[in-house]
């Protein structure tokens, strides 16, 4: 039991337990999902023992600084002595949130989790302090299929992804990075992600097309099939096309929804040829008053819903497309017109206005579905 206690101390720092719940941790009746909210200044961390049998574990640390844990556990201990105990845990999905975490403690937790059957890891609202030590020669990486990061800051700046990557096995399939403090990476340090098929950079409004070029390290994401760029400050489809071409990224599905896109293309900008692999493009909620220039010549799916189109697109304005979605545009709704300049009326169909409330929920939810098929 003492050994298990040490393990949990490494994994502690979950989400949104009801304010009326007297205990910090709650395990459902099926022993499937366990949620802890340690909001007290001096929480009783032992309550987390309830989560030992759960498949999904969420731990929210209430913004506490976890540095005192370094005095209570040996983060440098050889985790192989815990291997059998860790393998017996049922946890497959782990969320850790709202804490200030020393990098040494994070590394200690990752070393222990490397012996677990964990497949999906979410880190959110964390401040990582200090630098991450290099991976020891005898250490094994964490075999994740999905890694999701939201509002995580790193003391190491642009090199954080490369430092974190060394603690992961190369089989990562889904990567989501939202509200990043440094969305650009140190590309010369980042190794390739050979198995990564879904990359979600949504909810980074300051990214922009120049930032996208810096984030898509050339030839480091060779297997990308799904790329989500919701609410990332993109300006034109052509600009995105150029960034993808420069990085050698050829997604099958591209989500540019919830960006304020311009329909016209800069005449001085070179023409960009989209990859023939792209067959699905989402341009919904983009404020478009007309079909933008520079779209791929052929698409299987094109979503132009919830824009500001005041007339049906002409055939010569559209690419060859099998599945076109135009729902929620003013020309389809009687009595809805485009706003005049300075008007308080947004010209947005009411149903679409309600849907924009979900903009904070990024494309991650869709992308993560592909990573849920673990054994």
Curated annotation (Swiss-Prot):
Membrane topology classification: Lipid-anchor; GPI-anchor
InterPro entries, per database record: Leu-rich_rpt (IPR001611), LRR_dom_sf (IPR032675), Monocyte_diff_Ag_CD14 (IPR016337)
Subunit structure: Interacts with LPS-bound LPB. Belongs to the lipopolysaccharide (LPS) receptor, a multi-protein complex containing at least CD14, LY96 and TLR4. Interacts with LPAR1. Interacts with the TLR2:TLR6 or TLR2:TLR1 heterodimers; upon interaction with ligands such as diacylated lipopeptides and triacylated lipopeptides, respectively. Interacts with MYO18A. Interacts with FSTL1.
Residues lipid-modified (GPI-anchor amidated asparagine): 345
Protein name: Monocyte differentiation antigen CD14
Propeptide: 346-375
A cellular-component GO term for this protein: secretory granule membrane
Compartment annotation: Cell membrane; Secreted; Membrane raft; Golgi apparatus
Protein modification: N- and O- glycosylated. O-glycosylated with a core 1 or possibly core 8 glycan.
One GO BP: cell surface pattern recognition receptor signaling pathway
Keywords linked to the UniProt accession: Cell membrane, Disulfide bond, Glycoprotein, Golgi apparatus, GPI-anchor, Immunity, Inflammatory response, Innate immunity, Leucine-rich repeat, Lipoprotein, Membrane, Repeat, Secreted, Signal
Gene Ontology MF term list: lipopolysaccharide binding; lipopolysaccharide immune receptor activity; lipoteichoic acid binding; molecular carrier activity; opsonin receptor activity; peptidoglycan immune receptor activity
Tissue expression per record: Detected on macrophages (at protein level). Expressed strongly on the surface of monocytes and weakly on the surface of granulocytes; also expressed by most tissue macrophages.
Domain comment quoted from the record: The C-terminal leucine-rich repeat (LRR) region is required for responses to smooth LPS.
Signal peptide: 1-19
Disulfide topology: 25-36, 34-51, 187-217, 241-272
Span list, region Required for response to bacterial lipopolysaccharide (LPS): 290-375
LRR repeats: 54-82, 83-118, 119-144, 145-172, 173-196, 197-224, 225-251, 252-278, 279-299, 300-321, 322-349
Organism per entry: Homo sapiens
Physiological role: Coreceptor for bacterial lipopolysaccharide. In concert with LBP, binds to monomeric lipopolysaccharide and delivers it to the LY96/TLR4 complex, thereby mediating the innate immune response to bacterial lipopolysaccharide (LPS). Acts via MyD88, TIRAP and TRAF6, leading to NF-kappa-B activation, cytokine secretion and the inflammatory response.
Gene3D superfamilies: Ribonuclease Inhibitor
Residues that carry a glycan: 37, 151, 282, 323, 336
Induction: The expression in monocytes is highly induced by 27-hydroxycholesterol, priming monocytes/macrophages such that LPS-mediated inflammatory reaction is accelerated. Secretion of soluble CD14 is also enhanced.
